From Swiss-Prot:
This is Bifunctional protein GlmU. Keywords: Acyltransferase, Cell shape, Cell wall biogenesis/degradation, Cytoplasm, Magnesium, Metal-binding, Multifunctional enzyme, Nucleotidyltransferase, Peptidoglycan synthesis, Repeat, Transferase. Pfam families: Hexapep, NTP_transf_3. It catalyses: alpha-D-glucosamine 1-phosphate + acetyl-CoA = N-acetyl-alpha-D-glucosamine 1-phosphate + CoA + H(+); N-acetyl-alpha-D-glucosamine 1-phosphate + UTP + H(+) = UDP-N-acetyl-alpha-D-glucosamine + diphosphate. Catalyzes the last two sequential reactions in the de novo biosynthetic pathway for UDP-N-acetylglucosamine (UDP-GlcNAc). The C-terminal domain catalyzes the transfer of acetyl group from acetyl coenzyme A to glucosamine-1-phosphate (GlcN-1-P) to produce N-acetylglucosamine-1-phosphate (GlcNAc-1-P), which is converted into UDP-GlcNAc by the transfer of uridine 5-monophosphate (from uridine 5-triphosphate), a reaction catalyzed by the N-terminal domain. UDP-N-acetyl-alpha-D-glucosamine binds at residues 11-14, 25, 78, 83-84, 144, 158, 173, 230, 319, 337, 352, 363. It comes from the Bacteria.
Length: 454
């Protein structure tokens, strides 16, 4: 982290036509979070930084998405598409406020890491005036080359303009930059548009800064940090890279993933050490799994809190508001939504628990349903400690079942049940001996008569 003031300009005005989508490109998601929000999280990870969004199509939606994670930000519309330097200058008002550092990043590079941006800012703190983030791809073909002389970056040369000798250079332009705030407007205003497209290219400020005798340098970051997203195939590739990073991070922190490539996490998933996750598990946003928990295969968790040594699945679904205490269990083909499950409570199979509180050590039998919705409103079911809910019971909310109560299997419970009570809510069984034989003979005769008449 650094204490220097910083303005991060996030370029998010691209049309994204290759995405073939009505959704602005930067709002497509990796690990459940919009691309642009990944970028904003990275710049915030470098220390104190104000954010200026340069937006185009879907401006309000883009701004709203960013403000959900970062609070109020400035947004500036790029009304004409006249190049990257022109896009940066759309935020002239913010730049003019005066900052120690200026970060220029792209809203479609979700894999940029805070440590890479921090390295660029640290170079500014050490005396650099302009820092370009570069990378070394397996093949540099098609990328702009970073031209260095005597430890200084002197120019960025595009592939089509490079000499044969320059094309041999493997150090390429990643597009992201950091520059000293006091020079920002002078450098940007000096960029011209004397080129075939008549556009203002941000890359030109390198040669301009070098010509002014400023300290211009480049740093190298991993290739995946500067991957831009232009189509759905690249979006999927970015998802794969992000997931692999997260899987490795968790395994190195003490989480067991039996088949890592089959487990998918969200941007904010928290898994504590000594959790074991079996194959084919999906984590949606806002999930926290405490130490020692076991997540069986084919489980889906979203907005859930899982306590220490709890057990989930297989084939379990935890929806937002599911809060499972220590050593509780939600087994196969169970769904839990907006419910607190007490310590040691068991919901073993084929059950729906919604808008409920289940006490410690209670047992919920197979096929139990909390009937929480009347078509208009949701109602709550409260089950005390050590209660036993027999299989195939329907608990019609609002209803409260006391501690140590016993609900007989197959019951429909519509009224509160006191502590230590036994409740039966079903018709009494009648057994008519010999009636089955009579019915079989009757139905056989009817069937035979139909066959003769054909």
């Amino acid at each position: 982290m650094t204490d220097r003031t910083c303005l991060s300009i996030v370029l998010a005005a691209g049309e994204g036509t290759r995405m073939k989508s009505n959704l602005p490109k930067v709002l497509h998601r990796v690990a459940g979070l919009p691309l642009v929000c990944h970028v904003v999280n990275a710049v915030r990870g470098t220390g104190k930084s104000d954010v200026a969004l340069v937006v185009g199509r879907g401006a309000e939606d883009v701004r709203s998405a960013v403000e959900k994670i970062a609070g109020p930000v400035s947004a500036f519309e790029q009304k004409e598409r006249l190049g990257t330097a022109h896009a940066v200058l759309a935020a002239r008002e913010a730049i003019a406020r005066g900052y120690d550092d200026l970060l220029i990043v792209f809203g479609d590079t979700p894999l940029i890491e805070a440590q890479s941006l921090l390295a660029a800012r640290e170079r500014l703190a050490q005396g650099a005036d302009l820092v370009v983030i570069g990378f070394r791809p397996a093949s540099p073909h098609g990328y702009g080359r970073l031209i260095e002389e005597g430890g200084q970056l002197v120019a960025i040369i595009e592939e089509k303009e490079a000499t044969d000798e320059q094309k041999k250079i493997g150090f390429c332009n990643g597009g992201l930059m950091a520059l000293r705030g006091q020079h920002a407007l002078a450098l940007l205003d000096a960029v011209g548009n004397d080129n075939a497209k008549g556009e203002y290219y941000l890359t030109d400020i390198v040669a301009i800064a070098h010509g002014k005798g400023l300290n211009v340098t480049a740093i190298e970051v991993p290739v995946d940090n500067v991957i831009g997203i232009n189509n759905r195939a690249e979006l999927a590739e970015a998802e794969t890279i992000w997931q692999n990073r997260k899987r490795r991070e968790l395994m190195l922190s003490g989480v067991t993933l039996i088949a890592p490539e089959t487990v998918f996490f969200s941007y904010d998933t928290v898994i504590e050490p000594d959790v074991v996750i079996e194959p084919n598990v999906f984590f949606g946003p806002s999930v926290h799994v405490a130490s020692g928990a076991l997540i069986h295969s084919f489980s889906h968790l979203e907005g859930a809190q899982v306590g220490e040594k709890a057990e989930i699945g297989p084939f379990a679904r935890l929806r937002p508001g599911a809060d499972l205490a220590e050593k509780s269990k939600v087994g196969n083909f169970c769904e839990v939504k907006n419910a607190k499950v007490g310590k040691g409570a068991k919901i073993n199979h084929l059950t729906y628990i919604g808008d409920a509180v289940i006490g410690a050590s209670s047992n919920i039998g197979a096929g139990t349903i909390t009937c929480n919705y009347d078509g208009y409103n949701k109602f709550k079911t409260i089950i005390g400690d050590n209660a036993f809910i027999g299989s195939n019971s329907s608990l019609v909310a609002p209803v409260e079942i006391g501690d140590n109560a016993y609900i007989a299997s197959g019951s429909v419970i519509t009224a509160d049940v006191p502590a230590d009570a036994l409740a039966l809510g079903r018709a009494r069984q009648e057994t008519k001996e010999g009636r089955a034989k009579i019915l079989r003979e009757k139905y056989a005769a009817i069937k035979a008569a139909k066959s003769v008449s054909k």
